[in-house]
Amino acid sequence: MGKQLELFETTASFDVLIENVAGWAKDKGIDKKENAPKQLLKVLEEVGETAGALLKSKDEEIKDGIGDSFVTIIILAKQLGLEPAECLEAAWNEIKDRTGKTENGVFIKN
């Protein structure tokens, strides 16, 4: 039962963070659907910065990059009228029973 409680507490704080990010985006005036193409570029920029940090083995920059990537994806989802948690749940439901094999540290689906 402890793991379920931890998951619930983590999920609850993740939900709060999502709403904080959405509120921040609204305050900055970047919450509108017409901004989605520009926001997608921000997502790609942050993922690219994360890749650069990973290649340099810079742990703090990796953590920052992953966090920034989350933020930009949350904003993009909200701009498109999507709930980030629902997007994650849909992806999880798609992959949870997926079969395949792992080669060189990468999972390859059947």
Report each predicted region and the residues it spans.
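Flexible "arm" and connector segments at domain edges
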Residues: M1-I66, F70-N110
